[in-house]
Amino acid sequence: MQFIDQAEIEVQAGKGGDGIVAFRREKYVPAGGPSGGNGGRGGSVILVAVEHLQTLLDFRYSRHFKAEDGKRGGPNNCTGANGSDRIIEVPRGTMIYDADTEEIIGDLVDNEQRLCIAQGGKGGLGNQHFLSNKNRAPEYALPGLEGEHRRIRLELKLLAEVGIIGLPNAGKSTLISALSSARPKIADYPFTTLIPNLGVVRKPTGDGTVFADIPGLIEGAHEGVGLGYDFLRHIERTRLLLHLVDLTAEDPIKDYQIIQQELEAYGRGLIDRPQIIGLNKLDAVDETVVTQIENDLSQITSDPIFKISAVARIGLDQMLQATWEQLDSNPSEVNISH
């Protein structure tokens, strides 16, 4: 399935039904009064967050959505039927912006959470409403009002508590595969992962925590280089970052610093997010080299460092234990209104 995390749509709420001009025409009532009914309300356009959608792919092909118009009023003071609302399903984690003003309209995080993005027009008043002492037989009614029209930008930000970050080929997909039942594509070359992968990792209590394998970031990612800016946004909702560093790389310390610089340049508090560092591919490097890298890294960061091998499953339990402790000690709410 193709991963689409941005889309722009156009929505049109329904027009209100027209009020009508009508008079009572009953036997034995020679001078019946006005009885024109009101028009029905136009349907609204409503977004609903659902769990079964993981991407905004559907909006690549369907971009125009219209709710039903209200029906015109009827005689005998009958109000016209309301137009049906147009319900649009989106994935949980979708942020909604006005495409013209960039104003944030809403953020749909919870399952079945709803948000009206275009209000249906009010129905027009029938001539029954214009009866007065001066005008006993009003010959006019009001038309229904137009429904709202808007251009909307949708932006999906993954709902994961832990984000796995690092340069391409650091072993992020291997790690999420080792920790969970997720089975991402894995190969020994950069940019194997072209979409974020989600996996549920079980705590000792049995509770599940969602981890996200964020596609490989590179220098200049905050400016859109590589897979860049589009995937940095998916880290925004996380509470904790697992930063993988490839021990077999030419300069692991520089690799670590590149990712830190990208987080800081992107802003929005990412550089302040708690981190746990995993020195990965322990099984492929001499122990003295690993010790030197660990010592050098500890000189520039106070974040906890673990020596692991995702493929050989070495050191993962200790790193996970630190992950659970970090999550338990930090607030569950992260500021995501950006």
From Swiss-Prot:
GO molecular function per UniProt: GTP binding; GTPase activity; magnesium ion binding
Annotated OBG-type G domain residues: 160-328
GO biological processes: ribosome biogenesis
Enzyme Commission code(s) on record: 3.6.5.-
EC class (word): hydrolase
Cofactor(s) required, per the database record: Mg(2+)
One Pfam family, short name: GTP1_OBG
SUPFAM superfamilies in the record: Obg GTP-binding protein N-terminal domain, P-loop containing nucleoside triphosphate hydrolases
Keywords linked to the UniProt accession: Cytoplasm, GTP-binding, Hydrolase, Magnesium, Metal-binding, Nucleotide-binding
GTP-binding among keywords: yes
Positions bound to Mg(2+): S173, T193
Gene Ontology CC terms, in alphabetical order: cytoplasm
Domain Obg: 1-159
Record localization: Cytoplasm
UniProt-annotated binding residues for GTP: 166-173, 191-195, 213-216, 280-283, 309-311
Function: An essential GTPase which binds GTP, GDP and possibly (p)ppGpp with moderate affinity, with high nucleotide exchange rates and a fairly low GTP hydrolysis rate. Plays a role in control of the cell cycle, stress response, ribosome biogenesis and in those bacteria that undergo differentiation, in morphogenesis control.
Family statement: Belongs to the TRAFAC class OBG-HflX-like GTPase superfamily. OBG GTPase family.
PANTHER family xrefs: DEVELOPMENTALLY REGULATED GTP-BINDING PROTEIN-RELATED, MITOCHONDRIAL RIBOSOME-ASSOCIATED GTPASE 2
Subunit structure: Monomer.
The name this protein goes by in its record: GTPase Obg
